[in-house]
Each structure stands twice: as C-alpha cells, then as structure tokens.
C-alpha cells in the first residue's frame, strides 16, 4: 500500500526487511521535487547515501553491506531519469534485490507543475528532459515517464507546499527510527585565558562564582574532585543558576530538533578551565542525561594545561 504525503501528513512507510541485515531505500521522483534534500536528511539520520549509482553497482553495494563486518546497514540510493531506460533499471534493481531476500522501499518525490517551473526558473537550470523543448514540456515528459514508478512506490511525498523543515520531519518519521529521536550534545569546559572554543554553539561564563583556586586545599584539585564540586555548587546562587541554565538548554535543544539540527556544543568557561567550569560542566551533564532523547558527552578542553 502506498503512503501519500502532501504538506505535513504522517508517513510512515512500510518496514524494510530487517532480517536481511541491510535496509534499502530507493529515492526517485520528479526532477526539482526534492530528491537531493531527502537524501541529505537520510544521510543526517545515519544512512549511507549514494547518488545515481548504475543499477549493477547498487546490487554490488548491497552485497558489500551484507558481507560480514560491513558497517553499511542502511543504504539509500538516489535514482533519476538521466537514462531513458530508467523504469526498466528500477525494475531490474528490485528483481536483483529480491534474489537476496531484500525488498527495497521506494520513495517518490513529486510537486505540482507550477512549483517545479518556479524552482527551475529560480535556479536558472534546464530540465534534464527538456532538450530543445520548453521547460513545461520537459516536466510533462518526465511525469509521464515516471507514472509506472509512482504507481508502485511505497511512499509518495508531494513537496509543493512543504518547507525544507516539513520535508525533513516527514522523512524522519518514515525512516529515522531511534536516530531521529537523538540529539548529540557536547558540554565543553574551557579557560577564557586560552581562548574561546571555536565550535561552541552556546557559551556560558561562570566566573561569577567564587574561585576555588584561592582555597589552599582545593587549589591542586580539579572540578572533577568531589571537594571542589561541593564547594562550587554550594556557593550562593550556584544551584539556582544550574537549574535555570538546564531549563534554558532544554528549550534550545527542542528548537534545534525542530530545525533539524542534531549536534550541539555548549561551552562553560572560567578563568583557567580547571575548577568552576569543570564542576559546572559535570553537574550539567548529569542533568542533561536524564533526557533519554539526548546523547550527552563531556569534554574538558583545558584540564591539565596548568
């Protein structure tokens, strides 16, 4: 049964043959309808994506994925109509994969003629089937050629009124699995005297907290030691700050998820990156890990530099 998505509908497509050891998705459809964007989303979700592989190479790639020790368990291949034998090529791939007990899912991307014309005119590109004809004629020829493919597709996505974000959400619901639910967050402590982290999405300065450096028994220790952590987190306002900042980050992470961003680096800085920033980073990681939708790691950039 074909699933048809227009605008913000709910996918999800049929399940692939998990017993075969590799899941295969063939992304096809009308030129300009968003095949490349769909492929990029699949890549972000951890799929191995190949663009316009010849049919015989698709089956070889699958064989490689089935081989012992291969890390390719999800393969997405973008197929277009550069070859006049495209429909036969797709049937050939399906038949070859069937001999390996694999039933690929076919995603068909489409859009209205008006929207396709607008996209081509905005990008000032010619249609692959246009030749010496008009753009509208090229689109019509492709639509007719792909009618048999569309009729047997597992998932049809109409991008006429879909934003990039909307397309991403539909692809994630259909093919994301656990990967679509996980955002990777790195909490990085650092010392301002060594410079700001270049890869930070957010930077927080915790130099407003008293510095354990001026406590003789704490000076040789780091924020990873319990005594330093207790000292830093026990200062007035420290626990309130930590809780409030955690709530703020939770809102930001959800915003990142809605925008399709799956990676985030939060930098926590103090003077030398040894005491306060380390203690706060460790405590923040503990709070963030309570969210099962996050994959959280901690990095202490400047620890040990003194």
Swiss-Prot record:
Binding site for GTP: 80-83
Keywords from the named record: ATP-binding, GTP-binding, Nucleotide-binding
UniProt xrefs under Pfam families: PapZ_C, RapZ-like_N
Signal sequence region: none
GO molecular-function terms, A-Z: ATP binding; GTP binding
Keyword set includes Transmembrane: no
InterPro entries recorded: P-loop_NTPase, RapZ-like, RapZ-like_N, RapZ_C
Residue positions binding ATP: 29-36
Family per similarity comment: Belongs to the RapZ-like family.
Record's function text: Displays ATPase and GTPase activities.
PANTHER family assigned: RNASE ADAPTER PROTEIN RAPZ
Protein name: Nucleotide-binding protein MMAR_2228
């Amino acid at each position: 049964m074909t699933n048809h998505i227009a605008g913000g509908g709910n996918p999800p497509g049929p399940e692939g043959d998990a017993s075969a050891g590799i899941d295969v998705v063939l992304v096809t459809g009308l030129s300009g309808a968003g095949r490349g964007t769909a492929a990029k989303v699949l890549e972000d979700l951890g799929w191995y994506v190949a663009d316009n592989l010849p049919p015989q190479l698709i089956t070889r790639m699958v064989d490689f994925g089935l081989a012992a020790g291969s890390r390719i368990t999800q393969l997405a291949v973008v197929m277009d109509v550069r070859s006049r034998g495209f429909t036969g090529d797709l049937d050939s791939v399906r038949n070859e994969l069937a001999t390996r007990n694999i039933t690929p899912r076919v995603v068909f991307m489409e859009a209205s003629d008006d929207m396709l014309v607008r996209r081509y005119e905005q990008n000032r590109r010619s249609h692959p089937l246009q030749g010496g004809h008009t753009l509208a004629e090229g689109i019509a020829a492709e639509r007719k050629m792909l009618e048999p493919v569309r009729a047997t597709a597992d998932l049809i996505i109409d991008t006429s009124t879909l934003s990039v974000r909307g397309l991403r959400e539909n692809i994630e619901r259909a093919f994301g699995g656990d990967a679509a639910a996980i955002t990777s967050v790195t909490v990085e402590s650092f010392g301002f005297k060594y410079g700001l982290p270049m890869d930070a999405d957010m930077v927080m300065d915790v130099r407003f907290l008293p510095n354990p450096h001026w406590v003789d028994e704490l000076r040789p220790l780091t924020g990873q030691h319990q005594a330093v952590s207790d000292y830093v987190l026990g200062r007035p306002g420290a626990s309130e700050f930590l809780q409030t900042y955690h709530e703020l980050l939770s809102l930001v992470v959800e915003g990142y998820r809605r925008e399709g961003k799956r990676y985030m680096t939060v930098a926590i800085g103090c003077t030398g990156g040894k005491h306060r920033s380390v203690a706060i980073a460790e405590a923040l990681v503990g709070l963030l890990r309570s969210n099962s939708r996050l994959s959280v790691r901690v990095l202490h950039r400047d620890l040990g530099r003194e």
